[in-house]
Amino acid sequence: MIETTDSLRDCLAPAKLNLFLHITGRRPDGYHTLQTVFQLLDWGDTLHFTRRDDGLITRSTEIADVPPEHDLTVRAATLLKAHTGSPEGVDIEIDKRLPMGAGLGGGSSDAATTLLALNRLWKLNLPRLELQALALKLGADVPFFVFGKNAFAQGVGEALDVVQLPPRHFLVVTPRVHVPTAAIFSEKALTRDSKPLTITDFPAELSCNTEWPESFGRNDMQQVVVGKYAEVAQVLRWFENVAPARMSGSGASVFAAFRSKAEAEAAQAKLPAEWNSAVTASLDQHPLFTFAS
């Protein structure tokens, strides 16, 4: 990251994985309650912020099918400006790497990085919990990225506790298909009654079991997505002879954990050439973590 008086450049908006995802119920308002472990990755979009004196919030990067007014970065900046009454403006540039509809949290992470970066650039000094409350207005996953540590999440994803996860390298494969989260949540076949866990149920296994992630829990959305999207099923079948794998979030990305980068890259080399993939390391903390207290 490069910081000047008027800009913050090369700000990573890290991807996330759901190491497991259990849906434990459905609230009267229609939102689902869940339990998951969020794992940060050292891979994601890169954002650049330049302060504007005219108070305008703009996005100078063209993104297909995402007009600026619908972009979560612009919405995050607008929300923060309204909340604080700041006279400042900003221009946002985005180097987009994470695919949309992939279960990697790309848009949510972009929004959180925007909140953290502008907290610094605009000299707002809002505490982390206040930023997390704002983040929840932008989406269920956004508070986690502001929280900035690997976490056990409950509720709709906003109740967060830090978890210590072993260092890993991951091979992430994303089929060329967009999976709409809302549509999967509305499926009648979706399991909504997984038995709630406690945070003490899994830390020891996470740190010592070589078969993680297959050894603990599951993704309750995976079976539904596999039934609707043959591309996701195909990737999971490919992994059966390579390493234990599962889907992240509502898909479409599928991941497997490896002890070393070399092992992950060796598996990646065997992939069909037409599949999108990345090898990435785990991350313990959001790169902009210190921009809130």
UniProtKB/Swiss-Prot annotation:
GO molecular function ontology, one term from the record: 4-(cytidine 5'-diphospho)-2-C-methyl-D-erythritol kinase activity
Disulfide bridge positions per record: none
Broad class of enzyme this protein falls into: transferase
Species whose genome carries this gene: Paraburkholderia phytofirmans (strain DSM 17436 / LMG 22146 / PsJN) (Burkholderia phytofirmans)
Protein name (record): 4-diphosphocytidyl-2-C-methyl-D-erythritol kinase
Family classification: Belongs to the GHMP kinase family. IspE subfamily.
Described purpose of this protein according to its UniProt entry: Catalyzes the phosphorylation of the position 2 hydroxy group of 4-diphosphocytidyl-2C-methyl-D-erythritol.
Active-site annotation: K16, D141
Annotated binding of ATP, by residue: P99, M100, G101, A102, G103, L104, G105, G106, G107, S108, S109
Catalyzed reaction equations: 4-CDP-2-C-methyl-D-erythritol + ATP = 4-CDP-2-C-methyl-D-erythritol 2-phosphate + ADP + H(+)
Keyword Membrane carried by entry: no
Pfam families: GHMP_kinases_C, GHMP_kinases_N
Keywords linked to the UniProt accession: ATP-binding, Isoprene biosynthesis, Kinase, Nucleotide-binding, Transferase
This enzyme's EC code(s): 2.7.1.148
Gene Ontology annotations of biological process type: isopentenyl diphosphate biosynthetic process, methylerythritol 4-phosphate pathway; terpenoid biosynthetic process
NCBIfam families according to UniProt: ispE, PRK14608.1
PANTHER family to which the protein is assigned, alphabetical: 4-DIPHOSPHOCYTIDYL-2-C-METHYL-D-ERYTHRITOL KINASE, CHLOROPLASTIC
Pathway where this protein functions: Isoprenoid biosynthesis; isopentenyl diphosphate biosynthesis via DXP pathway; isopentenyl diphosphate from 1-deoxy-D-xylulose 5-phosphate: step 3/6
InterPro entries the UniProt entry points to: GHMP_kinase_C_dom, GHMP_kinase_C_sf, GHMP_kinase_N_dom, IspE, Ribosomal_Su5_D2-typ_SF, Ribsml_uS5_D2-typ_fold_subgr
